[in-house]
């Protein structure tokens, strides 16, 4: 180590370029990529005549030179991140990529990891992948292996509000597949105790068919609280997706459990599994009209006007997802015109998608919403040319 100090000292005075090249080469050799990052900024500051005491700080950079130093900062951060990834140190790499808002290289590195990691590494990766949203679905897969379903459900519930809809959907798919596989394996084991020569590979639906005895005496084959949560998560999955039918099978299984094992939800999901069977059948276009009527009846029969918007929200969501936009607009105009634009169902966006700007204008006028009415005018198609 002492040799490098001598080498640096022997570089001719005034040859700063050679000095920094020698320094960088040594830091790369030592795999000291944090100091390599600092050295790149020190070099740029030296070239600009700036103080060198705090090489990585931007606080001592005049505004006129800030853009130049920031460009070097980004390049140096990218270099350090790449080197840390090559060394297999994802958390250290993320320190740099996070600052420059380039998550993809880290997401790609996390994607390449096996689903089972050493316990000493998994927590840091989970923090980055799931809680910081770099690769949530891989985070879910890792957590299922490391901590099991219960902890993963809790983590997903905590993280879901910070995830983009596509990320939330991918995580829900992973949860559905995991629980479906576990439940199918458990039910198959129970059936094989009575039918030793049961052929492998049957679906959960096939295994349950004609075997009501599976549920006798309050019997169950998976943690029922896990089943409840995963079926709820599955509502975020958009068709077409194989996982929707898997979720339907989970709901069908749940509907056969003893009533004491069927935990209710908020209306219209108070009859939890029966309602979810209808919900997933709408998405799968299996008896869609009957399934939609179930939710319409729940809305019509609700005595409390304050509770009707949530029931209408579910029905409008299903109508939109099954491309029935005109009835969705009519229902939304009645119950959801004041809904937050951050919600899944936006009244204004629905009107635009359905080509019903006239309804948007009518509702905003009735509400004395000048801003909304102006937006509707601006969104209106131009009149046909004469």
PLM feature spans:
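Long, low-complexity, acidic Ser/Pro- and Gly-enriched intrinsically disordered regions
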Residues: 1-98, 104-105, 110-386
